[in-house]
């Protein structure tokens, strides 16, 4: 097996959308029912994707809103971003658009690995954002999209596998696009 690769992933989104629950479900395989607002946590996990082992460092950020100032650390050595909203919250869906814009401004790249996640899909009766709305937003960003339920452990692993694939796809395109110069 090839040597493991290290990847750092930031999880961003409005408060109470389930960023920590999704991350803990992936890392520890459990759902945390209580809610304590996150300041910032970092988790690590080994995962194998397509035969390649990855050592993931997951930065579970504090909830952002439209007025939040992004710390510069969210742009340094980050290989991919998971942007999370709740399918039960119009506000979180609107704020994720603002977060995406700020992220692009901060990182300064046209193409960055982004995974848009509509969380809390198990709350059918409270849903206000359709699957189609989430998918359309992700497509407008040229980003991957999944809906998830951290509580029911639906697609938590898929979310993190997918962001790795997105990061590798963009890394591969960037390395192929590099030009070389020869002096003779």
Swiss-Prot record:
Cross-link (Glycyl lysine isopeptide (Lys-Gly) (interchain with G-Cter in ubiquitin)): 8
Residues involved in GTP binding: 16, 18-21, 32, 35, 38, 119, 122, 150
Keyword Ubl conjugation assigned: yes
UniProt-listed Pfam families: Ras
Catalytic activity: GTP + H2O = GDP + phosphate + H(+)
Binding site residues for Mg(2+): 20, 38
Lineage: superkingdom: Eukaryota
Further remarks about this protein from its record: The conserved catalytic Gln-64 found in other Ras-like GTPases seems not to be involved in GTP hydrolysis in RHEB.
Functional summary from the UniProt entry: Small GTPase that acts as an allosteric activator of the canonical mTORC1 complex, an evolutionarily conserved central nutrient sensor that stimulates anabolic reactions and macromolecule biosynthesis to promote cellular biomass generation and growth.
This protein's name: GTP-binding protein Rheb
Species per Swiss-Prot/TrEMBL record: Rattus norvegicus
């Amino acid at each position: 097996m090839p040597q493991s690769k290290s990847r750092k992933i930031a999880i961003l989104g409005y408060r109470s959308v389930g960023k920590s629950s999704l991350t803990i479900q992936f890392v520890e395989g459990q759902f945390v029912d209580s809610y304590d607002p996150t300041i910032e946590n970092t988790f690590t996990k080994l995962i194998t994707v397509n035969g390649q082992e990855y050592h993931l460092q997951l930065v579970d950020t504090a909830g952002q809103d439209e007025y939040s100032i992004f710390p510069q650390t969210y742009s340094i050595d980050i290989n991919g971003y998971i942007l999370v909203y709740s399918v039960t919250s119009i506000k979180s869906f609107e704020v994720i658009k603002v977060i995406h814009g700020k992220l692009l401004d901060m990182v300064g790249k046209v193409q960055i690995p982004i995974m848009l996640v509509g969380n809390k899909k198990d709350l059918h009766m409270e849903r206000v954002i359709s699957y189609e709305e989430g998918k359309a937003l992700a497509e407008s960003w040229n980003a991957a999209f999944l809906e998830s339920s951290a509580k029911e452990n639906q697609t938590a692993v898929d979310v993190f596998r997918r962001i790795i694939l997105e990061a590798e796809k963009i890394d591969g395109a960037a390395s192929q696009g590099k030009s070389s110069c020869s002096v003779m």
